[in-house]
């Protein structure tokens, strides 16, 4: 199928959905955090983790952001034993009014392990979170693919979609993805080494970088849909966001964004289109839609060299 044919096909697919619901005329974004209870921190000391979580949640509440946090339950253990303090961090999220989702137990890639192994890991990943949610009167319903990997074949992707439906899960998409974890790894390393100047430089570079990321996503959405779409942003529960989410939220408001729930974002007709992330690439939904329409999504903006240097080997690892 040629590029023009793909593009026409995409438009024809989207027209019925665009006609069935009014598209958002303003910029909206749902915010999600992966790898709870924590990722990229200078220390795993209980006191620090409690303080970091409190600061992050305080920023979310102060900015009126209805976030969802996605849990890797392997991180609830210490030396293979369930750690009450780390479980307590999830309770803090729930008691602050936020929702939790399943990010698998051990952050496996569906592109790299057999489907049955991945499904078992997902179910193991609800052992603690599910009863915690139930005690708060909430339903565990959101699932986020680690690495955004959805399987390398149509058969695996279809079988896993059926598995999710059978277990009451809804996939949480991502349209704004970035190497935020590189900044976070660099920031945590600078903090761990007591280099306050480096941590300040890294933190100061973070929000301007994310502004460029959003500009790219906004343009790609316009190229595909001819309008703004309700975006879904993925971040991580780390010390960088605990210290700088308020500045990130301020930047987004200056760009005209209103924060919405994940449910609200998925009401955008764009998400009803019969296209999604290509799976094997681990791309955002927006990039997947573009590639399937015969377009080449832009590369992420380059991370500043000093940030990459501070991140070290973490800069080579994806989340």
PLM region spans:
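Positively charged n-region of N-terminal signal peptides that target proteins for export
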Residues: 1-7
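Sec/Tat signal peptide C-region and signal peptidase I cleavage site
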Residues: 17-21
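Active-site beta->alpha N-cap acidic-glycine motif
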Residues: 22-148, 233, 251
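Glycine-enriched alpha-helix->loop->beta-strand junction motifs that scaffold or abut catalytic
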Residues: 96-97, 165-170
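Short, basic, helix/turn surface patches
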Residues: 94-102, 128-135, 196-214, 283-303, ...
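Bacterial N-terminal signal peptides
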Residues: 7-16
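Alpha-helical scaffold elements lining the catalytic groove of polysaccharide deacetylases
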Residues: 82, 108-134, 153-167, 175-227, ...
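C-terminal domain-boundary segment and adjacent tail
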Residues: 64-67, 173, 227, 237-319
């Amino acid at each position: 199928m040629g590029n023009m044919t793909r593009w026409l096909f995409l438009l024809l697919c989207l027209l019925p959905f665009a006609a069935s619901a009014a598209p958002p005329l303003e910029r909206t974004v749902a915010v999600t955090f992966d790898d709870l209870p924590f990722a990229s921190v200078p220390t795993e000391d209980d006191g620090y983790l409690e303080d970091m979580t409190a600061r992050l949640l305080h920023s979310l509440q102060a900015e009126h952001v209805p976030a969802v946090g996605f849990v890797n339950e392997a991180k609830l253990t210490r030396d293979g034993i369930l750690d009450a303090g780390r479980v307590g961090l999830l309770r803090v999220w729930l008691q602050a009014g936020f929702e939790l989702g399943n990010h698998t137990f051990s952050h496996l890639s569906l592109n790299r392990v057999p489907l049955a192994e991945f499904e078992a890991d997902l179910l193991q990943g609800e052992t603690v979170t599910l009863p915690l949610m139930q005690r708060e009167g909430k339903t565990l319903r959101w699932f986020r693919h680690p690495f955004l990997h959805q399987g390398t074949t149509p058969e695996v992707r279809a079988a896993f979609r059926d598995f999710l439906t059978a277990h009451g899960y809804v996939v949480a998409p991502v349209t704004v993805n970035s190497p935020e974890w590189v900044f976070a790894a660099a920031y945590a390393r600078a903090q761990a080494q007591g280099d306050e100047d480096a941590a300040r430089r890294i933190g100061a570079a973070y929000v301007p970088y994310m502004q460029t990321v959003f500009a790219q996503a906004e343009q790609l959405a316009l190229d595909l849909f001819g309008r703004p779409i309700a975006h879904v942003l993925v971040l991580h529960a780390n010390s960088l966001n605990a210290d700088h989410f308020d500045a990130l939220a301020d930047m987004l408001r200056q760009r005209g964004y209103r924060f919405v729930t994940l449910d609200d974002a998925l009401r955008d007709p764009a998400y009803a289109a019969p296209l999604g992330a290509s799976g094997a690439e681990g791309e955002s939904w927006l990039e997947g839609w573009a590639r399937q329409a015969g377009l080449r999504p832009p590369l992420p903006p380059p991370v500043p060299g000093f940030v990459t240097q501070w991140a070290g080997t973490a800069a080579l690892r994806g989340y």
